[in-house]
């Protein structure tokens, strides 16, 4: 006897399972089954496809008028941080620049101070609250970065919190050491601080899967970033890079040269970098909510990357300064509107390709896969990025069990 059957599904979303990320035109290929059925036993998918009455189960969910998809994958978050920076919104409205806010004690260094002052247990409680919000919105696989400690003690603290979250909630979670995220005030120079972070690589390896660096004007140069990435690979890490967010420094090209698993942001990437994606499996992780939140007009050139047969994914970039959202559904809407992605491209970018960007087996519904699914209160898959700003996730299913039920229930 099977454990659960989800029947009469209006649309069953079945992204294609591949060894490599979907590239170029492949991103627009999505198998959407009308009147579908999913059968689950022992936390695994037994069957997913056209409606069938050939299976029995102890529990049945009628998904008439609903969409079922793989659980979403958020491939770029800064989940563990102390404090918040809502007071900066009024400063920005007054026309204060980032540097002016930084000089007033705000900006990233204020988050660094708050993170350093927050105990590991309190940091865990805050991050857990934010993680549970993600889960309620349909995410069951997450990448979590450090980068607000900027010293040995606090970078380790962030990574330990991330690992504790993964263990407690038994999630598909990957952890990224982003020690070189900024340069703390106490550092004698960018170069000296970078060497401190490189020296930490062997120690943080037990807590982190990836090593990341912020390659940008005023932070770390292309040469420094390459040096760090090479040292990280020597220490056994797969590498990522925050690249070309503001200036076209060539971070995307560097990521491809160093065979990074992903290059993230890429708002200012050059045509040369986009062309180089053609012969690479590096995933371009685009973060349109960041551009939206910062009030900027120029978004990453997703269409140019796809035209060059590149692989792209989408993520929230959840952080307290430039993308204060842990709702990946909102990112899907912004991507459709501002990156000009089709609904099919959006769905692949938050499932199978996002999984490739963090090297996990997720984002698909195939026989034998973990039964990590979302039942959406929506008539079709196009509706979810179309009707933005609310939570469409009705039920979230992890390992075959309903762990979130957002069904509205109230007394008139």
Curated annotation (Swiss-Prot):
Transmembrane segments: none annotated. Pathway: Amino-acid degradation; L-histidine degradation into L-glutamate; N-formimidoyl-L-glutamate from L-histidine: step 3/3. It comes from Staphylococcus aureus (strain bovine RF122 / ET3-1). Zn(2+) binds at residues 76, 78, 242, 317. This is Imidazolonepropionase. It catalyses: 4-imidazolone-5-propanoate + H2O = N-formimidoyl-L-glutamate. N-formimidoyl-L-glutamate binds at residues 148, 319, 321. Coiled coil: none annotated. It comes from the Bacteria.
């Amino acid at each position: 006897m099977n454990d659960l059957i989800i029947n009469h599904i209006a649309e069953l979303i079945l992204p294609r399972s591949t060894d490599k990320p979907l590239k170029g035109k492949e991103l627009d290929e999505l198998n959407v089954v009308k009147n579908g059925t999913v059968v689950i036993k022992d936390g695994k998918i037994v069957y997913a496809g056209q409606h069938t009455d050939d299976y029995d189960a102890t529990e049945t969910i009628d998904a008439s008028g609903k969409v079922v998809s793989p659980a979403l994958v958020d491939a770029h978050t800064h989940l563990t941080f102390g404090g918040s920076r809502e007071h900066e919104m009024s400063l920005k409205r007054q026309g204060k620049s980032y540097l002016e806010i930084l000089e007033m004690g705000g900006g990233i260094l204020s988050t660094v101070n708050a993170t350093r002052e927050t105990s590991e247990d309190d940091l865990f409680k805050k991050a857990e609250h934010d993680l549970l919000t993600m889960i309620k919105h349909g995410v069951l696989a997450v990448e979590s970065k450090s980068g607000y400690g900027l010293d040995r003690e606090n970078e380790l603290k962030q990574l330990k919190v991330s690992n504790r979250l993964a263990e407690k909630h038994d999630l598909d979670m990957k952890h990224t050491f982003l020690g070189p995220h900024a340069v703390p005030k106490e550092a004698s120079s960018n170069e000296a601080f970078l060497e401190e972070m490189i020296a930490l690589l062997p120690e943080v390896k037990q807590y982190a899967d990836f090593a990341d660096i912020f390659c940008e004007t005023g932070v770390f140069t292309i040469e420094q970033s390459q040096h760090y990435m090479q040292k990280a690979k020597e220490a056994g890490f797969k590498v990522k890079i925050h690249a070309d967010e503001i200036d076209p420094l060539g971070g995307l090209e560097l990521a491809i040269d160093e065979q990074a698993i992903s290059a993230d942001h890429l708002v200012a990437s050059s045509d040369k970098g986009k062309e180089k994606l053609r012969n690479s499996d590096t995933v371009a992780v685009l973060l349109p909510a960041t551009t939206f939140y910062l009030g900027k007009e120029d978004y990453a050139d997703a269409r140019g990357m796809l035209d060059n047969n590149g692989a792209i994914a989408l993520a929230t970039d959840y952080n307290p300064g430039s993308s204060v959202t842990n709702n990946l559904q909102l990112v899907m809407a912004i991507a459709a509107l501002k990156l000009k992605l089709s609904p099919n491209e959006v769905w692949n970018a938050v499932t199978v390709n996002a999984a490739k960007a963090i090297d996990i087996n997720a984002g698909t519904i195939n026989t034998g896969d973990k039964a990590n699914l979302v039942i959406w209160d929506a008539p079709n898959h196009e509706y979810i990025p179309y009707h933005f700003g609310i939570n469409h996730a009705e039920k979230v299913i992890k390992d075959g069990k309903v762990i979130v039920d957002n069904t509205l229930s109230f007394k008139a």
